[in-house]
Amino acid sequence: TWIAYLVAGLGGLAAPLFVMIFGWGLVRSKSTTNGNIIKATILLLLQLLVNLFSPHLFEPLTPGILSLFALLILIKPLIVNMANNNISFLVFSISIFLIYGLSSFIYNIQGTSDWDSRVSTNNVTILVSHLFLTGTYPLFPWITFAVVGAFLGSSITEGGKTLPRNNTTLLLIIIGMSYCLVSLILANEEGSVWAHPTKGAYLNFFPANIGFMIGSMTGVLIFWLIIQELQISLFEYCGRLSLTIYVLHFIPLTLLSNIENERYWSVMEASLAVVIYTTAWLLFAFVWNRLQWLTIEALIRKLSSG
């Protein structure tokens, strides 16, 4: 239904936006090499904590978005170079499309859509593969959002804005929206699933196919423009506490999952639950913003600056 697509679509933008904001902060960070190593270590430990919070989703050592952040911190010099050098940025963009072409027509390097396979960590080889290619949030292709975020962070425009309102931005959004509209029409005519976490014919999250990358990048750019132009302080509060919220939100999410298993929710019930749950975290960020010292972000800053 359209409600399911709307709620799932907004939820699907959370991770891309999270990674893009991380890239934006990465290029603006003044941390030393030792500080970055400490941050990466803490993020890996937090990934373990998240996995333990959600045994119904992950194995203890399953790589996820926080282990992705750890890798991004460790390769920060490379990301900064691509963000500040137009030629490097262009080469990176072309490389991403070439790798997708290779994966689609020659050899599937992203693994299967089976969830159990993507979270399984039976041996070191699989663990490393999940970190870079076949996991839930592997370095490829999710590094793309970080590089774009870093690019925006290094190109401040008028009034301190990072995403310029120009013809290039408008053209990118139009191309992305056109792809989504055309693919939605084709999926409807074919009777196939347009977008799905693991079974999407055109937009697939696990693994993140090229359609998902186009659609989510378009959505994030639109969302970024809206927040930038309207200067919505509530979202700014969430941005400051994004890591704390991400780690903590798995605790009640696990409880909600147990409730859903006991009684199957309808699409309307599930959608309403998502809206209420999301709103609750917005309010949490507004209140907790006064207690910045009591956040995971503050803890990481303190440990990495010592």
Please give the residue ranges for each predicted region.
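Alpha-helical transmembrane segments and their immediate juxtamembrane cytosolic regions
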Residues: 1-306
